[in-house]
Regions:
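Short, charged/polar "capping" segments at the starts of alpha-helices
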Residues: 1-9, 125-127
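Short, flexible loop/turn elements at secondary-structure junctions
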Residues: 26-29, 76, 93-95, 119-122, ...
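Catalytic core and acceptor-binding pocket of nucleotide-sugar-dependent glycosyltransferases
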Residues: 95-99, 117, 137-212
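Short beta-strand-to-loop element that shapes/binds the nucleotide-sugar donor at the catalytic cleft/hinge
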Residues: 115-131
Length: 212
């Protein structure tokens, strides 16, 4: 409740120009979270890289980040604003993304086709060939999922591809966050994506053309 009240205090004054629909439901009430939580908890008992004290990558973190593709699917199905494009933006992205006020409107005015995301550290097919080897030290950097846009006609396939890879990782007692899932998703289904390059600070600034 504290979060929704805070968000409304920011969004509601902009209602004439930026209408907002709110879906208020605890993440723990979604089947995706409830069903997979115990599986991931069990898996991590057997993987040393996930048993380091103080590590931020908890079971909830893996599920919360991967939920992004489900949230996009739900938004597309409800289609509140009859739009052809959607965007995911991490709450609190200002701590890492540059020039949000300048770049975000330009992106919304001219979105890239397909699933458009920033690839930070390219991973070859050889690097991705064996899941256990790729995840042996945790979650290597690949694609960024802090912000990306999605053309509506690609969201169903993107969701299914992400869930396929997420479930494969769970089956092999692995998994770190959505960014590793998306890295494998691009490797296997590159036709779903419009890729650009950069690093975390330039995810927005490089969306239309490289600046860093």
């Amino acid at each position: 409740n504290e979060t929704i009240d805070y968000i409304k205090s920011i969004r509601d004054p902009l209602a004439d120009h930026c209408p907002t629909e709110y879906i208020v439901k605890p993440l723990t009430d979604y089947e995706f979270y409830a069903y997979n939580f115990d599986i991931i908890q069990h898996n991590r008992k057997y993987r040393g890289q996930y048993n380091i004290p103080g590590q931020r990558n908890t079971t909830s973190y893996f599920l919360i980040t991967t939920f992004k593709c489900i949230a996009l699917l739900l938004a597309k199905q409800r289609n509140f604003f009859n739009t052809q494009y959607y965007a995911w933006v991490d709450l609190g992205c200002n701590h890492v993304l540059k020039n949000v006020q300048e770049c975000a409107p330009a992106i919304l005015d001219n979105p890239q086709p397909k699933i458009s995301a920033c690839y930070i550290h390219y991973r070859s097919k050889e690097e991705l060939a064996d899941l256990a080897t790729f995840f042996k030290d945790g979650g290597p950097c690949g694609m960024a999922a802090t912000f990306f846009t999605a053309e509506a006609t690609y969201i169903d396939r993107f969701y299914n591809a992400m869930m396929e890879i997420f479930n494969e990782q769970l089956c092999k007692q692995l998994g770190h966050s959505d960014e590793q899932v998306m890295t494998y998703c691009y490797d296997r289904y590159p036709d779903l994506f419009t890729i650009y390059n950069g690093e975390y600070y330039s995810i927005l600034t490089n969306y239309h053309q490289p600046k860093t």
